[in-house]
Swiss-Prot record:
Induction: By DNA damage, as part of the SOS response. It comes from Escherichia fergusonii (strain ATCC 35469 / DSM 13698 / CCUG 18766 / IAM 14443 / JCM 21226 / LMG 7866 / NBRC 102419 / NCTC 12128 / CDC 0568-73). Pfam families: SulA. Residues 162-169 are annotated as: Lon protease binding. Belongs to the SulA family. Keywords: Cell cycle, Cell division, DNA damage, Septation, SOS response. This is Cell division inhibitor SulA.
């Protein structure tokens, strides 16, 4: 049987459209990277913002990874916060360059529902792009926690929360 080239193009076009629609649908549930800037003298504000989300993510079968600079998470705090102790992993005492690299690797695996890392400096555009790609690949969330002192905060912008989301752009 003979089929024209036009018919073949038409079917390949509809396949391409279906594939694009499938990718678009998949991307709406893809990963997210967000930067949370908070005052060091008011850590409770950050907990109020993030704990409900972390509790909800704790219901997934995946881990939560905390990359903390020096402090160690208290078992009592994790349990009192309603987070699943059996799904929370922590790595501490990482240098800032290792924190970003570790976040990228962890997000990419898909083993973590959320990866939280502390950084003193803002991300470069390249680092942010790498984190976004890794979060999308692993269908995970990443939070960059950036503390500022009360003195620094007074001279900076008034907004303390920077949320990157494809839902609003």
């Amino acid at each position: 049987m003979y089929t024209s080239g036009y018919a073949n193009r038409s079917s390949s076009f509809s396949t391409a459209v279906n594939n694009t629609a499938r990718v678009a649908t998949t991307n709406t549930t893809a990963g997210l990277i967000s930067e949370v800037v908070y005052r060091e003298d008011q850590p409770m504000m950050t907990q109020l913002l993030l704990l409900p989300l972390l509790q909800q993510l704790g219901q997934q079968s995946r881990w939560q990874l905390w990359l903390t600079p020096q402090q160690k998470l208290s078992r009592e705090w994790v349990q009192a916060s309603g987070l699943p102790l059996s799904k929370v992993m922590q790595i501490n005492q990482l240098s800032p360059c290792h924190t970003v690299e570790s976040m990228i690797r962890a997000l990419r695996t898909g083993n973590y529902s959320v990866v939280i890392g502390w950084l003193a400096e803002e991300l470069t555009e390249e680092e942010h792009a790498e984190l976004v790609n890794a979060a999308n690949e692993g269908n995970a969330m990443g939070f960059i926690m950036r503390p500022v002192s009360a003195r620094t905060h007074a001279t900076r912008q008034l907004s303390g929360l920077k949320i990157h989301s494809n839902l609003y752009h």
